[in-house]
């Protein structure tokens, strides 16, 4: 079974305890609210444009920039030097690390961005975790809800794993890159340093790291390690 350590470098990060305590990596999604209730102290240290809306129960660290028309609901915690760009919509229960981007027309809810993760343009990040240095190409959607409204079941190695979650988008390991208009189906666990090509729909499942995923198949080739 994949673990949080297989996907993410979280040592010394703001949610290290939550990651360490999770039996399964997607269990962290259910810990976000409790983490914020325990640690969040609302304060605005960054810069907020007058036309942006920042509701109560939000922490913005030093160097955070919130651009015109952005809307941030609480509870939300945003780390140093991150940007919330024009028209972004953060719907609460969100933890954003340092040097991250929540981009133009991007919607985020119940999610974690580890340091340096970027969702720059027209993305949907719901009930998901982005590892360090993840970059989502424009229009990337991390779908989080099944058409039958049932629990998300992971299909991997011939097994059916009930996650216990009705809403579960994707876990993208450190360094994952997605091309424009790519989509992950509800319940995608993608290992570190994978590339997802543009216009690809990734089926539900657990994917090892250092792979290239494209619309012609689940696994095309292994990437050469840098």
Kindly label every feature range from the protein language model:
Residues 55-56, 61, 73-74, 92, ...:
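Short loop/turn microsegments at loop-to-beta-strand junctions
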Residues 59, 77, 95, 171, ...:
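ABC ATPase A-loop
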Residues 3-23, 57, 69, 75, ...:
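N-terminal short leaders/motifs
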Residues 66-68, 72-77, 82-112, 116-121, ...:
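Extended, compositionally simple hydrophobic/Ser/Thr-rich segments
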Residues 1-51, 193, 208-226:
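Terminal amphipathic alpha-helical/low-complexity segments used for targeting or macromolecular assembly
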């Amino acid at each position: 079974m994949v673990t949080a350590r297989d996907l993410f470098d979280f040592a010394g990060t703001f949610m290290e305890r939550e990651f360490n305590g999770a039996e399964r990596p997607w269990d962290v999604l259910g810990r976000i609210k409790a983490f914020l209730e325990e640690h969040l102290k609302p304060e605005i240290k960054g810069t907020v444009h007058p036309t942006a809306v920042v509701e109560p129960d939000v922490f913005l660290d030093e160097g955070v920039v919130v651009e015109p028309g952005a809307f941030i609901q609480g509870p939300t915690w945003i780390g140093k030097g991150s940007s919330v760009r024009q028209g972004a919509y953060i719907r609460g229960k969100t933890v954003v690390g340092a040097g991250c981007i929540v981009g133009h027309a991007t919607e985020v809810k119940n999610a974690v961005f580890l340091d340096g993760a970027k969702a720059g343009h027209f993305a949907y990040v719901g009930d998901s975790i982005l590892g360090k240095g993840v970059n989502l190409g424009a229009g990337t959607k991390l779908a989080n809800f099944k058409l039958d409204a049932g629990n998300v079941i992971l299909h991997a190695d011939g097994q059916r794993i009930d996650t216990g979650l009705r809403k579960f988008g994707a876990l993208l390991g450190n360094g994952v890159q997605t091309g424009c208009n790519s989509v992950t189906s509800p319940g995608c666990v993608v290992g570190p340093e994978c590339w997802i090509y543009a216009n690809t729909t990734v089926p539900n499942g657990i994917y090892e790291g250092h792979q290239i995923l494209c619309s012609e198949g689940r696994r095309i080739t292994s990437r050469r390690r840098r």
